[in-house]
Amino acid sequence: MFERFTEKAIKVIMLAQEEARRLGHNFVGTEQILLGLIGEGTGIAAKVLKSMGVNLKDARVEVEKIIGRGSGFVAVEIPFTPRAKRVLELSLEEARQLGHNYIGTEHLLLGLIREGEGVAARVLENLALDLTKVRTQVIRLLGDTAEVSATNGQTKGKTPTLEEFGSNLTQKAAEGKLDPVIGRQKEIERVIQILGRRTKNNPILIGEPGVGKTAIAEGLAQRINNRDVPDILEDKRVVTLDIGLLVAGTKYRGEFEERLKKIIDEIRVANNVILVIDEVHTLIGAGAAEGAIDAANILKPALARGEMQCIGATTLEEYRKHIEKDSALERRFQPVMVGEPSVEETIEILYGLRDRYEKHHKLVISDEALSAAAKFADQYIADRFLPDKAIDLIDEAGSRVRLMNSQLPPAARELDKELREILKQKDEAVRSQDFETAGQLRDREMEIKAQIAAIAHSKKGDEENTKEVSVVTEEDIAQIVAAWTGIPVNKMTRSESEKLLQMEETLHGRIIGQDEAVVAVSKAIRRARVGLKNPNRPIASFIFSGPTGVGKTELTKALASYFFGSEEAMVRLDMSEYMERHTVSKLIGSPPGYVGYNEGGQLTESVRRRPYTVVLFDEIEKGHPDVFNLLLQILEDGRLTDSKGRTVDFKNTLLILTSNVGSKVIEKGGGGLGFDLSEDQTESQYGRIKALVNEELKQYFRPEFLNRLDEIIVFRQLTKDEVGEIAEIMLKEVFTRISEKGIQLEVTARFKTHLINEGYNPIYGARPLRRAVMRLLEDTLSEEFLAEKIKEGDTAVVDVDDDGKVKVLLGEKLELVAN
């Protein structure tokens, strides 16, 4: 019998057992069932009793008057009294007479009244209730609910189970609760055609997440409500089924199947329901315990025979993973592909939705903001789909503008802070019974509240006088895109414009020489930030080639630090780690079946997380040649597909490849035959070296790879003067480190000249200088530290004697070059 009970009826029985325990009785009688009915609170029985003035407290008093309290010993299993069992049987009979195939709280109450001789009936009589009137009221309420469901659903038959686990979209459309559906005429027409079939009349909407599959079902409901459909669909109602709610609370075996069968039977009898199941793949496996059958198999016969019309919606991936595997289920559904709308169609959709969002956020959304949302979403948000991502931009921009404009003025915020402090002090004064202080604080509290109210009122008055309405502009959309992706789309401030114009100067503070490289990188960044770059290619792609130790990797670090915030704000791939052929998979992720398949690739995952960044392929020639094949798509189209089939967008990255190809040529000096008659010998030598390096690159890299690069930049060898400037930078770094230990360090001009002579090597660049600083300065100082010759607070001067030996002098002031 209990399998027919509704969840509310089961709750009543459980509450009845609790009442028995509370009173110390080891049985459940009619009086406990009555207390359970009142205590349940939400069922028809509880509503009827409440409307007639019965409450739980009074009922408990009456029950205790009649039967008193028990011994206190209560068994775990509490049996029903014969009279209570009789009530349950009568409630089943009442349900049958009313044509219901379930037992609810209303049937239990009718059973109690019909039994008429138990303690429950006496309690109701003692509470001045007429049992006949209670019965009439229950039946009337049952009739009303049936009528309400009939009128709301335009139904011929009653569908209580479907209404419990579903949501009527046609009714929502009539109440204006659905967003308007713009476009999608072809898809809706195709859905209507499939619904008009005699058998297998079940369309399934397949498309990427966020393209508007559910919106098509809502569009159909709106059309039915507007009578803009063929006559075969005119009286239909569209009901969306909640699979989660259907499964929830099914504690016992067969309960889920029974619910689903009831829904199928109700739809078959009503014959005017179009069932919508969003995320239709959840049917497969839903409710399937060990040995039980799942929802999909229960629905199959009804779907094939045309007894029920069902619209499913799922993504391409889930369709392939779940439904295509079950060919018997697949043939019952007719696929309708829902593609991503174009930018123009998205703008139309946004125009249609504008009123709803303006009403919600209480502001105005400009036409430029709508166009910008569609264009920016398409260009900068790669891993989601239109129109969903564009709608999200509008929604969040509206929220941002509203919150910014609804904030209190600074004066009111200060007062609010003071008010909180006064309230805290007042509470403490009351607790310590210092009522005089509490009274003074209360007066101050009233003053501050009045001041805050006056400021808020004047702000509101100013807004009303100026008739200013908050407006969402293109700039607001750009701010949201920047917050989501890190790509600066918003208009440049004057300070940022100046920063970009002075970029070469700033980079030269760290990179000595190498004008060509610094200028090329700066131009690329400016082009991208102003928005003049090709939107389908990366910001720029360079090969930095040339001798070792001249600043190729350092320039990339300086760029990341200056423009992207920190040296770490770049994706750095040391190609020496990709020397074997199979390590290429580390870039885009392991193929299926291999270890690490679910982890994604180092390159693709980094760029997906941070789409606006510098990507550095360091020492490119050390990697396996197959790595270069991967780079072809990135360099040309700014895209790469990872091992899971996801397209990663490289259109907002700056690609830099460093290489030492040609360093042997540079080592030889690039000298030509005959006399050098040019005025500038250095320039002609650089020209020859550049030509030779380009030839070497052509021999090493494929032409289709080199042809895709924006520029091949050959770095110059460092002159002695440039090494002197680099020495200044390195010495400053040492001074900073040693000043943290409380020591002031100075070097003489003689030491500096000696350092440059020791560290200058045109073939190896600045690295010998770094070694010279370490050997001559850092090693000497560390020995002095350990010998405790230098202590905190000292001023140390580093010099060299005539033999070239480094000396550390304390407190002596010599001719200083660097501080």
Swiss-Prot record:
Region feature (Repeat 1): 5-70
UniProt KW keywords: ATP-binding, Chaperone, Chloroplast, Nucleotide-binding, Plastid, Repeat
Domain of life: Eukaryota
Residues involved in ATP binding: 207-214, 546-553
II: annotated span: 472-663
CDD domains (alphabetical): AAA, RecA-like_ClpB_Hsp104-like
Domain Clp R, chain residue ranges per copy: 2-144
Keyword Cell wall biogenesis/degradation carried by entry: no
Family in the record: Belongs to the ClpA/ClpB family.
Protein name: ATP-dependent Clp protease ATP-binding subunit ClpA homolog
Taxonomic source organism: Guillardia theta
